[in-house]
Amino acid sequence: DTYENIFTSAARILLKEKKGLDADSFSEELQSIVVKEYSSNLSKAAVNRAIDWLHRAGIIGFAGKLTGCDILSYKAKARVFFMDLGLTTYFLTQTGCTPGDIQGVVNENFVFLDLRRRILFPREIALETPAFATWGNYEIDFYVKSIKGQHTYAVEVKSGKNSSWTMEEVLEKKKADYIL
């Protein structure tokens, strides 16, 4: 089933991806996985139609990418998230990943959904979609700029209490006003 394969492949992308996509877009990354692992007769157009349908149906959502914590470097559709945490958990389980990995991705997905809500009316944060950022060779799970106050926040989704070196450096270099 094409959609089942797309769901599972999207879950794999969520698991492996920490710096954006290898390909130029989520659809190219997804197509390469689906074609390689499931069916070589699926065209790019067919994969794009399936992705568009899933997005319009509210099943998946996209996050952008900010290079160097620069709000002006926004690149759309750099990462995909499921719009339902039950789907997220189900398809991550189908990939065979560990419970710890599932919990980490579900936590990040939850934050994505909350940030997405804050972009909708009444708008609280900037950008078209929630976005992650890169800083050197590292990733910041989400980078947010408030509409009111214009403050920037580097958000790291963790299950523990320790802050990462990357977050401290981002704050020290004044790439974000606050770290969460």
Q: Each PLM stretch: what is its role?
A:
Residues 81, 153-155, 178-180:
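Hydrophobic/aromatic beta-strand patches that form the interior of the parallel beta-sheet core
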